[in-house]
Amino acid sequence: MVKPLVSYGSVMSGVGGEGVPSALAILASWGWTFDTPNHESGISPDTTPADSIRGAAVASPDQPLHGGPEREATAPSFSPTRADDGPPCTDGPYVTFDTLFMVSSIDELGRRQLTDTIRKDLRLSLAKFSIACTKTSSFSGNAPRHHRRGAFQRGTRAPRSNKSLQMFVLCKRAHAARVREQLRVVIQSRKPRKYYTRSSDGRLCPAVPVFVHEFVSSEPMRLHRDNVMLASGAE
């Protein structure tokens, strides 16, 4: 088990008295043992302490530490080349996913309508895939939302709220390319006149900045079937 790092308070407590203990002294107090360094010809005397710590050098990524406890191998990441188009793996009442898309927009009017449109489009166009799509969530800054009428002088505007809005789509890695392409299509096919964004100077512009970020999980993510849009024909 890896021990936590020593806090600055405990390390610096001896300043002005016994002095700051060395890293080797701290490791020795934890029970670490050290071999006496043997500087052979051609080996620099500045060899790092890790080279002389018993059990610190790993002979092979597939072998345990010499003289130390065995460690379980790190679980490999999901393969991005899986081609099965069936429903995702199920674990009882849960459905397993490994890829997440985040669709976000900032300071945009009509953003809820846009994310609702994306959700409906994915439900219809990707009906043969099992996916999960969250409802719209919003985050705002510390700027005040409500102001008294006449609180701002004429010619000035209220501070920006910096409100952002996100939605999340989960799917299998094998279906990520289809989901990514469908997100691009539905975002680009929107009617620009229906959506507006607030620029930094306060003016409204007929455009919607929409950002799509993709994440891959090294471990399966499980959602209950009641929260998943199951593939057509899936039980």
From Swiss-Prot:
Localization in the cell: Host nucleus
Residue ranges, compositional bias (Polar residues): 38-50
Post-translational modification: Phosphorylated.
Region (Disordered): 38-89, 138-157
Keywords of this entry: Host nucleus, Phosphoprotein
Keyword Repressor: no
Domain of life where this protein originates: Viruses
Cellular component aspect of the GO annotation: host cell nucleus
InterPro entries per the UniProt record, alphabetical: Herpes_UL3 (IPR005035)
UniProt family annotation: Belongs to the alphaherpesvirinae HHV-1 UL3 family.
Name the UniProt record assigns to this protein: Nuclear phosphoprotein UL3
